């Protein structure tokens, strides 16, 4: 492809920065021609040839995509992503560098060229700027100021920002003290009405404005603790922490639990009337005088503690139960046990041998009856056992009461299971 001589504007040998390996570049000397490729539309281009014969076109750069032209660049400039491959000798020859930036859609690519001298570099830069209608950004100053990189521009913007801050501070110093105090006072009051202090030591923070501090601190009433002098905002009362000497625990199969987690036995003082005889056992609680206990001694946990028969009782036993209205089909084995007991009493008076034989049978029967009525076992209240090392609570159980004492007890299933586990734990420790 040959270019007519009338279309050629400028031509000559220039060195171009070219990438030939990964992360490696080198400067290659090619022949460049600046010409008009379309006079009707006034379009220009720079063609790159391998030699001055202009018979092998390497690449064409269209000037309608030019966005900027830079001159007087150096190899050490960070904007040039190309190094001198020949060391210091090659770097000394790369003095007259200029760059042309092209924009393709959203991508900007730079073409860096090296001229032989400053006059040739200036000629190329002026012709490209005239054809692309570009203007110089810096009309004053030397040529080295025009070659400053983007880093210097960032430093200038930061300097201007610092100057604006200094001017604001100087302006604030010139404000009269009365106006400045009024403005600070208004700012403090707005903060105190719209927001709460995030720091618990808000009232103790130093503040030069005593009046605003008094206004703000009057909104929050503070109290001081006995341990330290740190003030806190007032709020709901906090319950006192539990003291260490009242740690009441029980050990169950290697597990440690709290005593208050076990439901306490309730004592009912009123008669519970049965309305439906089919759904219930037909029993009522007797209105009897409660069993007399000695005066209670309030423990550290807040519940009464009684002493009876040399044992420390924490809770009182439930009232007796009336079984007069219980259906006959629910009595069953208990009546038979009563009949055998009556016979055993008579046998003691009449014949000693018979009573001994019958008493053994009765004891076996009572044991089988106890095993069948495990869901109705009655437990004594929890006793306090004091050891030399640690004061603990252990629940001990007794045998099932006879029907003459308490004929029938309705015990909650969950409560019974809890007491049974405590009994097994006590037996295993023994």
From Swiss-Prot:
Disruption phenotype: Causes a decrease in synaptic levels of lev-1, unc-38 and unc-49, a moderate resistance to paralysis induced by nicotine and levamisole and a mild increase in uncoordinated movements. In addition, forms ectopic muscle membrane extension during larval stage. Rescues fluid accumulation in clr-1 e1745ts mutant. Partially suppresses multi-vulva formation and partially restores fertility in let-60 1046gf mutant. Prevents constitutive dauer formation in daf-2 m577 mutant. Changing residue 171 to F: Likely abolishes phosphorylation. Almost complete rescue of fluid accumulation in clr-1 e1745ts mutant. No rescue of fluid accumulation in clr-1 e1745ts mutant. The PH domain is required for fluid homeostasis. The C-terminal domain is required for fluid homeostasis. InterPro entries: Gab1-4-like, PH-like_dom_sf, PH_domain. Interacts (via C-terminus) with sem-5 (probably via SH3 domain 2). Interacts with nicotinic acetylcholine receptor. The lineage of its organism: Eukaryota, Metazoa, Ecdysozoa, Nematoda, Chromadorea. It comes from Caenorhabditis elegans. Keywords: Phosphoprotein. Changing residue 200 to A: Rescues fluid accumulation in clr-1 e1745ts mutant. Changing residue 293 to F: Likely abolishes phosphorylation. Almost complete rescue of fluid accumulation in clr-1 e1745ts mutant. No rescue of fluid accumulation in clr-1 e1745ts mutant. Residues 7-133 form the PH domain. Changing residue 20 to F: Likely abolishes phosphorylation. Almost complete rescue of fluid accumulation in clr-1 e1745ts mutant. No rescue of fluid accumulation in clr-1 e1745ts mutant. This is Multisubstrate adapter protein soc-1. Changing residue 220 to F: Likely abolishes phosphorylation. Almost complete rescue of fluid accumulation in clr-1 e1745ts mutant. No rescue of fluid accumulation in clr-1 e1745ts mutant. May be phosphorylated. Residues 192-222 have a biased composition (Low complexity). The gene is soc-1. Adapter protein which modulates signaling mediated by several receptor tyrosine kinases. Plays a role in fluid homeostasis, probably downstream of receptor egl-15 and upstream of let-60/Ras. Involved in nicotinic acetylcholine receptor (nAChR)-mediated sensitivity to nicotine and levamisole and gamma-aminobutyric acid (GABA)receptor-mediated sensitivity to muscimol. Regulates synaptic levels of nAchR receptor subunit lev-1 and unc-38, and GABA receptor subunit unc-49 in the nerve cord, probably downstream of egl-15. Regulates motility. The keyword GTP-binding does not apply. Gene3D superfamilies: Pleckstrin-homology domain (PH domain)/Phosphotyrosine-binding domain (PTB) (2.30.29.30).
């Amino acid at each position: 492809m040959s270019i007519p001589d009338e279309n050629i504007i400028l031509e000559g040998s220039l060195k171009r920065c070219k990438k030939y390996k990964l992360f490696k570049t080198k400067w290659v000397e090619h022949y460049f021609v600046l010409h008009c490729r379309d006079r009707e539309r006034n379009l220009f281009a720079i063609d790159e040839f391998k030699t001055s014969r202009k018979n092998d076109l390497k690449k064409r750069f269209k000037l309608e995509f030019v966005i900027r032209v830079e001159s007087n660049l150096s190899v050490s400039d960070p904007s040039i992503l190309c190094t001198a491959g020949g060391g210091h000798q090659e770097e000394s020859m790369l003095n007259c560098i200029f760059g042309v930036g092209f924009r393709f859609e959203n991508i900007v690519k730079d073409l860096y060229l090296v001229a032989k001298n400053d006059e040739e570099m200036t000629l190329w830069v002026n012709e490209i700027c005239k054809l692309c209608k570009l203007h110089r950004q810096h009309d004053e100053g030397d040529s080295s100021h025009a070659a400053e990189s983007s880093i210097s521009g960032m430093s200038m913007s930061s300097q201007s920002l610092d100057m604006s801050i200094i001017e604001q501070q100087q302006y604030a110093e010139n404000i009269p003290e009365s106006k400045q105090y009024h403005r600070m006072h208004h700012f403090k009051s707005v903060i105190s009405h719209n927001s709460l202090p995030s720091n618990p030591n808000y009232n103790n923070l130093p503040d030069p404005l005593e009046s605003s501090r008094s206004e703000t601190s009057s909104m929050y009433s503070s109290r001081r603790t006995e341990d330290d002098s740190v003030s806190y905002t007032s709020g709901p009362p906090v319950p006192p922490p539990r003291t260490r000497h009242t740690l009441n625990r029980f050990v169950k199969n290697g597990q440690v639990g709290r005593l208050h987690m076990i439901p306490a036995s309730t004592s009912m003082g009123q008669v519970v009337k049965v309305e439906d005889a089919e759904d219930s056992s037909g029993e009522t609680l007797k209105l009897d005088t409660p069993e007399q206990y000695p005066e209670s001694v309030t423990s550290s946990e807040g519940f009464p503690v009684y002493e009876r028969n040399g044992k420390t009782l924490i809770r009182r036993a439930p009232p007796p139960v009336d079984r007069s209205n219980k259906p006959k089909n629910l009595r069953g084995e208990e009546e038979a046990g009563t009949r055998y007991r009556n016979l055993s009493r008579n046998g003691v008076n009449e014949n000693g041998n018979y009573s001994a034989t019958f008493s053994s049978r009765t004891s076996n029967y009572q044991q089988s009856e106890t095993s069948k009525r495990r869901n109705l076992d009655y437990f004594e209240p929890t006793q306090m056992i004091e050891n030399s090392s640690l004061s603990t609570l252990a629940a001990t159980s007794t045998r099932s009461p006879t029907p003459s004492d308490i004929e029938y007890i309705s015990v909650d299933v969950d409560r019974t299971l809890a007491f049974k586990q405590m009994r097994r734990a006590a037996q295993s420790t023994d």
